[in-house]
Amino acid sequence: MKYNVMFFGTPEIAKIVLETLFNMPEVNLIGVVSQPDSHFDRKKNVVYSPVKQFCLDHDIKLFQPQKIKEIEEEIRSLAPDIIITCAFGQFINQGIIDIPKYKIVNVHASLLPKLRGGAPIHYAILNGDLQTGITLMHTIKKMDAGNILFQRSLAINEQTTTKILTLELANLGALMIKEHFLELVKSDLVGIQQDENDVSFAYNIQKNQNIIDFNKPAFFVNRFVNAMYDKPIAIMEYNDVLIKVHQIKITNQKSTQKPGTIAISKHQIFVSTQDFNVELLLIQLPNKKPLAPKALLNGKNPFSN
């Protein structure tokens, strides 16, 4: 038996879940809803989201409303049996929540009730959590507060970046949808209520929240850079130049200078923190490609002033 399925999502993590649904024999993918185009390249050409590009490549019916409520009647006319969502980026109104027979199931990238919100992967790393995971949950009007249906965890280490963890969680979420789909399309699936006493939040990273604070200990600075990679990427300011910091390494050198002080040794760049120096391994000047310090220091750069 095939089930009529709609999918709501936008970024790469959502595309991987969508691709799995598209290839499942029990799924009839009747439509996808994604955020409106909002990214442009240097030539001001529109850059399609991963989900939109997948839909265009596979001739899938796509909706991009400014607000999801605008297409409520179109969704109703498609009569989805179930709606799957992942990193969609809009609140879903009650009218749409009530449409599918088997409800809306959200693929959320945390072990709920921890880290409700739009940036759970960033904050799992920022918080120094030892594990995170995927929660399949029923969507209700309150953000990420619906009943937990299935959960599975993944380990996090000090080298884990948001880019790496996003891919791992995307693959895990896709696998869980594949394994549990026939259970999700059962009317008697209720799940477990979330414990409101254990709730924490992971709101979207805002502008200027990606600036490195070298007054923090080195372990936190390293964690921060990992959490911001590869979006939005951590930044530091030096000689009035904003520098993107892609990768650093904690050294065993005790910091003897004021936090944020730069020291250059041959082809290496070090920055002092609250306790230990960190070494910049991959950095990027404005409108340039990311470079290792050895290559960057050979040319014109803010560190030679």
Curated annotation (Swiss-Prot):
EC top class, as a word: transferase
Entry GO terms, CC: cytosol
CDD domains (UniProt xref): FMT_core_Met-tRNA-FMT_N, Met_tRNA_FMT_C
One GO MF term: methionyl-tRNA formyltransferase activity
EC numbers: 2.1.2.9
InterPro entries per the UniProt record, alphabetical: Fmt, Formyl_trans_C, Formyl_transf_N, Formyl_transf_N_sf, Formyl_transferase-like_C_sf, Met-tRNA-FMT_C, Met-tRNA-FMT_N
Binding, (6S)-5,6,7,8-tetrahydrofolate: 110-113
Catalytic activity as recorded in UniProt: L-methionyl-tRNA(fMet) + (6R)-10-formyltetrahydrofolate = N-formyl-L-methionyl-tRNA(fMet) + (6S)-5,6,7,8-tetrahydrofolate + H(+)
Keywords in alphabetical order: Protein biosynthesis, Transferase
Superkingdom per UniProt: Bacteria
Family stated for the protein in its record: Belongs to the Fmt family.
PANTHER family for this protein: METHIONYL-TRNA FORMYLTRANSFERASE, METHIONYL-TRNA FORMYLTRANSFERASE, MITOCHONDRIAL
Protein function: Attaches a formyl group to the free amino group of methionyl-tRNA(fMet). The formyl group appears to play a dual role in the initiator identity of N-formylmethionyl-tRNA by promoting its recognition by IF2 and preventing the misappropriation of this tRNA by the elongation apparatus.
Protein name: Methionyl-tRNA formyltransferase
Species, as recorded: Ureaplasma urealyticum serovar 10 (strain ATCC 33699 / Western)
